[in-house]
Amino acid sequence: MDTPLRRSRRLGGLRPESPESLTSVSRTRRALVEFESNPEETREPGSPPSVQRAGLGSPERPPKTSPGSPRLQQGAGLESPQGQPEPGAASPQRQQDLHLESPQRQPEYSPESPRCQPKPSEEAPKCSQDQGVLASELAQNKEELTPGAPQHQLPPVPGSPEPYPGQQAPGPEPSQPLLELTPRAPGSPRGQHEPSKPPPAGETVTGGFGAKKRKGSSSQAPASKKLNKEELPVIPKGKPKSGRVWKDRSKKRFSQMLQDKPLRTSWQRKMKERQERKLAKDFARHLEEEKERRRQEKKQRRAENLKRRLENERKAEVVQVIRNPAKLKRAKKKQLRSIEKRDTLALLQKQPPQQPAAKI
């Protein structure tokens, strides 16, 4: 049987406390008796004892902690167990806690245990010291726990959904709080490390950071809603009577709109536009007058040309005075058509006519 040797290896790194710790053996016995009387408080009915003994043959290793929060695992003792211990990786202090929880291994940690007897020089005070610390913590945790506080809660595992505030997370087994493996100074009291505080009665334990975040978000949510309601009042828009729902109600009709000053023209601009209109009218009238003048000039020139032509023709006429009327009687009709009568008074005045003139 090499079990005492393993226990001596595991407990080799711890320093013995002052001899005052030997007086706590009686308190350890009382705590162990109380723990034996009701072992169902810290263990579920369906949990087998073989799970609790999983770390008996494991060598001495530091406890596995998550990379983000080493203190969170130590403070999660009574609030929520971390799950079943991994075989071969559990710390020696946790193995002692598991031995205390199982009723089959409880006689090994009593003061009369044969495993503490092979080396009484160094290991006897160490065993009693560890048992005294565990017993004091068990008694303190039992006093702090209230009947209404649930004991089986799991912390929020990364990757698993967080339980709701009214929902209890299932847990396989409760576990005792993890102890610090660093050796304490001889003068430091036993209760120096921070024990995990259980939640108050009537509250369910959820993830610490998740609960804080939810509380902060719930406190900020109503404030933002109030601000939104105050800033943006909702005014429902009804359907217009005309049925033209695409028209904007903020726009007014053209008859109701007032003209701005930029729409009114200045006096200088008005006078300039009036002058431009007057010039255009004058130019148009001038063009009409020119056209009429040219027409009149052309008409007058035509009349003058006609008059001049008539005068030229009259000057070019050959006048023959027929003094014998019988000659006219003998003339043919064709010749008579070409004969025209002229007033020869002027000619007669120059030359006194003896006979009426006749143009042949």
From Swiss-Prot:
PANTHER family: COILED-COIL DOMAIN-CONTAINING PROTEIN 86. The modification Citrulline is found at residue 342. (Microbial infection) Interacts with hepatitis C virus (HCV) protein NS5A. It comes from the Eukaryota. Residues 153-164 have a biased composition (Pro residues). Citrullinated by PADI4. This is Coiled-coil domain-containing protein 86. Residues 345-360 have a biased composition (Low complexity). GO terms for cellular component: chromosome; nucleolus; nucleoplasm; nucleus. Keywords: Chromosome, Citrullination, Coiled coil, Host-virus interaction, Nucleus, Phosphoprotein. Residues 1-12, 238-254 have a biased composition (Basic residues). Residues 1-313, 328-360 are annotated as: Disordered. The modification Phosphoserine is found at residues 18, 21, 24, 47, 50, 58, 66, 69, 80, 91, 102, 110, 113, 128, 188, 217-218. Residues 273-295, 302-313 have a biased composition (Basic and acidic residues). The lineage of its organism: Eukaryota, Metazoa, Chordata, Craniata, Vertebrata. Transmembrane segments: none annotated. Required for proper chromosome segregation during mitosis and error-free mitotic progression. It is found in: Nucleus; Chromosome; Nucleus, Nucleolus. One of its GO terms (molecular function) is RNA binding. Pfam families: Cgr1 (PF03879).
